Amino acid sequence: MISAIIPTLNAEATLERTLLSLNGSPLITEIIVTDGASTDRTRGLAENFGAKLCFAEQGRGQQLAAGATQAQQNWLLFLHADTALEPGWEEEAEDFINHYPSQSAAVFRFTLDESYFLARALECLVRLRGFLFALPYGDQGLLISKKFYNELGGFRAIPLMEDVDIIRRIGRHHLVFLKSKAITSAERYRRNGYVIRPLKNLCCLMMYFFGVSPKFIKKFYR
């Protein structure tokens, strides 16, 4: 029923948890790992889980698009390599597939994998952003029918902001926020700070809306 598509680049530290959250699910009939020239154990982990391994130029947009072209199922689940879906996510996802129009897409609930109070505060801000502006994080995954995805033109080969780009094309009225959690690694927030990293994300978003080149935004993001 669903092809799961995971873009990777040196993701050995988190990929196993992501694959475990999908492996054995009755809804997931295909897992595609699209790798951007990893030099660690990423490819071996993918193969050990029986995932279909394909390769693409580095860049999340390019890698997601390449994975989608390999998908054989009618539904696509795009998921970052540092994000795992909580147990039981299938029930809500199946309900979405069965009861919402085919021209709809769904995202999961942003959750970080640590108990620090700033992590909870950030989760609340992300939910508020989704409620007010219908702009979820890419970390929340994306469940969409292959037909609707193709009608939208799919992910574009841009180095950053590919998630915002496709969400804007989906549109607020076609987007469903599920309650099931997408549990994301908090490593980058621990490394860069729970204030600096979100502010940097916001700056990137504002630059994108003002028409700044995604290539420049990527340099700033780094």
Regions found by a protein language model. Name each.
Residues 5-24:
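Short, well-formed alpha-helical segments that are part of the catalytic scaffolds
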Residues 13-17, 40-49:
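Acidic helix N-cap motif at the loop->helix transition within catalytic regions
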Residues 29, 43-70:
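Conserved donor nucleotide-binding strand/loop of the catalytic core
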Residues 35-43, 83:
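A conserved acidic beta->alpha catalytic loop
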Residues 88-118:
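Conserved donor NDP-sugar-binding/catalytic core segment of glycosyltransferases
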Residues 76:
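Short aromatic/hydrophobic "clamp" motif used to bind/position activated sugar donors
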Residues 168-222:
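Hydrophobic helical membrane-anchoring modules
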Residues 1-3, 30, 165:
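Cell-envelope/extracellular polymer assembly enzymes that use nucleotide-activated donors
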